[in-house]
């Protein structure tokens, strides 16, 4: 399967003990459980060996439990490259990207779901804006 091929390629990469691993949508051929398993493995590798892992991924929800730094591109142009929180703040300042920020934070905060905790979801823009203000964002609209 595609997932097995992805794991085999990762194993071959790890055999040479690289300091940096760059992956382009490594879970595109995997189901959600396989994707989360692979990202759990990559995170464990990072924690154990200090390997820097750079991932290009359009399904950001797969990565949110592990993200420390984030690069955001818009129409091929760099918007920001910073910590997760700083990148989210920069996105919030961009009128076109602002609607993505509540979902981004909700996903990041949703890490607890891995441990059996279900977080409430924002039902209105006002709820999202209130949460963003608690997190230190300025402005009244999400």
Predicted features and spans:
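H-loop/switch region of ABC-family ATPase nucleotide-binding domains
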Residues: 57-58
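Conserved catalytic motifs of ABC-family nucleotide-binding domains
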Residues: 17
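A short, surface-exposed alpha-helical micro-motif characterized by mixed small hydrophobic
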Residues: 63-65
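Hydrophobic anchor residue at the start of the ABC signature
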Residues: 10
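Helix N-cap at the start of a conserved alpha-helix in ABC-type nucleotide-binding domains
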Residues: 32-34
């Amino acid at each position: 399967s595609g997932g097995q091929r992805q794991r085999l390629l990762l194993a071959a990469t790890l055999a040479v003990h690289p300091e940096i691993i760059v992956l382009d949508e490594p879970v595109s051929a995997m189901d959600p459980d396989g994707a989360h398993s692979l990202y759990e493995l990559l995170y464990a590798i990072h924690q154990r060996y200090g390997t820097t892992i750079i991932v290009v991924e359009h399904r950001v929800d797969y990565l949110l439990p592990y993200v420390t730094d984030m690069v955001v591109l818009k129409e091929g142009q760099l918007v920001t490259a910073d910590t997760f929180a700083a990148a989210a703040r920069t996105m919030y300042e961009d009128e076109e990207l602002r609607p993505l920020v509540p979902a981004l934070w909700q996903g990041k905060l949703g890490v607890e779901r891995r441990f059996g905790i279900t977080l409430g979801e924002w039902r209105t823009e006002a709820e999202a804006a209130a949460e963003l203000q608690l997190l230190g964002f300025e402005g009244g609209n999400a």
